Amino acid sequence: GTCQMGYGGSVTINGGTVKATAKGNGFGIGGARIYNTGAMTVTINEGTIEATANRNNAAIGDKGKGESGVTINGGVIHAVGKGGAAGIGSKGDIRITDGELTVSAEGSGAAIGGFTDSYSERVDCESITINGDVIKSISSKDGACIGAATGGSVGSITISDAELPLLSSNKILIGWDADSPGGKLTIRNCRVASTDTLSVLTDGIRVGSNSELVIEESEIRLPHLRGIRVGGNGSIAVRDSDLHTYGIFMDENAKSPNDAKTLKRLEITDSTVLTGDIIGARGEYSSVEEIVIRGSIIRLNDEYTYNRCTIGGGEKASFGSIDIQDSQIDSRSSVNAVIGNGTQSQSYGESLIRIANSQVSVRNELFGPAIGAAYGSSGGQINILIENSTVTAKGGNLRSGTDYIPGIGKNSSGRASEIGKIQILNSTVESFRLEEKDGTNYVYDKLHTKELPGIPAENITICGSTVNGKTIDHSFDEYGKCTLCDKYDLGYCYEHGLLTLEGLTDCAHDGSEKKLTGLSHQTGENETKQLTENTDYTASYSNNVAPYTLTPEDEGFDPAKAPKVTLYGTGNYCGKAEHYFTISE
């Protein structure tokens, strides 16, 4: 093999065996202690490498004032950082695409990422890119396994197509916790797990303020007390993934309203989440603008002794909207609403809870409703919309013998929290309250008779639904508009030939998904409205690729195999319609 020293401090290793130890304040392999003004890069293409940094900087790395970076394209590499050193570190870009790496940091440095330099100054990494199953073992103490040194940040981290089954750290596993001007952490098509046993709440995957965290097509297994967390003004997106985590949240615990922080957006799409704590904002004065849950399953991890999960804002804070569609939620909470805001929340605007096309079972264990305004909250207006769903909600224990806590809404005692409108459309809802203080006997509350604390009867709409065993049907005109809820019902419109579906006739198999190209509704004798997806309706498909030529009228028709589109009303539309179609050979 060869080892080349380039002008300005660049190092390239193409093979052989290299053992390097920095006993003082230098790098094991890479930049010198007195930092060069030119380019200082390290490239490893092959070889067997053992490198150690005993005090600071990195076992493999650099800190040039010009171009700076570490690139690893192969090799069997063992890198150890001690003191403030990283195992592999750089001021610039770290890119790892191949090889077999065993990396550790035994002090404040990251195993891969940031470190402390010879002048005791923290060095933050611009970017870290890891592609492929290259990490065989990685551990750290007070810095991250992959990310920043203690108190530092990273510009961006991208980890893809990787197996990381044995992460171990006293602090963060992946990411950083410092305030930052804006960074992004992306984990895509990975399996991430940790074997740590913890006694206190510790961040698992974390980014600081003003940053974005994205998890896609991945399996994340974090041990008890490790969560997925962002800082203030951050956002989280989880897509097509399977997560076991203590929670998914912003946790800021501000001391006063002047220090209040906000989670901008939390999205969970087509994922399964097994959790034991908050999904949304956690702590005092911690608000959330938007929570979007689509096609996902969220339930409690029975292994957790503290086993309560809320979806929404933190204490003394607020939320903008919680939109749950095509999902399954099974959870319980204490004091905070399971779906809604935290205790003593203060809001000055309107908030929306929407549950559509979903199955929800939630229970509050203390003082508040399961869905709506938590105990002690005040101001603002929470609107609740339930459509095409099955919901069971149980209110919490009473504060006194005269208290009344419904499953959905607000409790009768405490501050004058506001519930605006409750709309229940095309759904089956059971809303329970405890009959007496410290009791165990649940009975239906009076949602079905529209007699809930602090909510005028005219603000409660129930249509095409069964609530607490009482069925209230729609009342349609000839074009499918209900005179009670003032919405058009897609089911009625479809059954009476008022809908025209485009793009699903004469479909031929070509390997592509067959979907609607248009949907229109006859709203009058000579009037037709073109409907807009995600405004008037949403659509879900099944079996819409493979050939299938039987219709519901044909002998041998199998609905489990037939191409189908299911339309769900939203906005000015409600209800659902199912349409089977054929795909020719």
Features from the language model and the residues they span:
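Surface-exposed loop/turn motifs in large extracellular/passenger domains
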Residues: 1-22, 29-53, 60-81, 87-106, ...
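Substrate-binding N-lobe of the ribokinase-like
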Residues: 144
